[in-house]
Amino acid sequence: MAHLLLLHGPNLNLLGTREPEIYGRITLPQIDAALAERATAAGHGLSSLQSNAEHVLIERIHATPEDGTAFILINPGAFTHTSVALRDALLAVALPFVEIHLSNPYTREPFRHHSYLADKALGVVCGFGVDSYRIALEGVIARLGSDV
């Protein structure tokens, strides 16, 4: 059994109400519950954290070596395009991670076209709405089954 950590960045607490034409109507607690259920069915544990504060996400990443986290799934939200600190934290703990986005940043404003995480991620899943999370989790489960 592996422990998986799911991190959500700024404004994702507003899912279901914020720009539903882009992000959909499903709420973050609904996403977390569905992913935790799927991880459990695959024999793994999953915990999640959402924060609008960069330092909270970084501190949680820093705690992963001591808590047995095997894999990180992260939707960094707007921190994707701005946070060298988040990138450095992920590199410091040296755990595999997948970057997730509900929308496809490359079809949006030009400032969203750059990710500070993508070149270090095992993979990036974007543009499939809520299914982006499910696809990412299935990829992680498959990797864990093959002894990353």
From Swiss-Prot:
A molecular function GO annotation: 3-dehydroquinate dehydratase activity
Catalytic activity: 3-dehydroquinate = 3-dehydroshikimate + H2O
Pfam families (alphabetical): DHquinase_II
SUPFAM superfamilies: Type II 3-dehydroquinate dehydratase
Taxonomy, superkingdom: Bacteria
Annotated CDD domains: DHQase_II
EC top class named in words: lyase
GO biological process, one term: amino acid biosynthetic process
Metabolic or biological pathway, per its Swiss-Prot or TrEMBL entry: Metabolic intermediate biosynthesis; chorismate biosynthesis; chorismate from D-erythrose 4-phosphate and phosphoenolpyruvate: step 3/7
Residues engaged in binding substrate: N75, H81, D88, L102, S103, R112
EC number: 4.2.1.10
Active site: Y23, H101
Keywords, comma-separated and alphabetical: Amino-acid biosynthesis, Aromatic amino acid biosynthesis, Lyase
Annotated site, Transition state stabilizer, chain positions: R18
Family in the record: Belongs to the type-II 3-dehydroquinase family.
Known function: Catalyzes a trans-dehydration via an enolate intermediate.
Assembly with partners or alone: Homododecamer.
Name used for this protein in its record: 3-dehydroquinate dehydratase
Species name: Xylella fastidiosa (strain 9a5c)
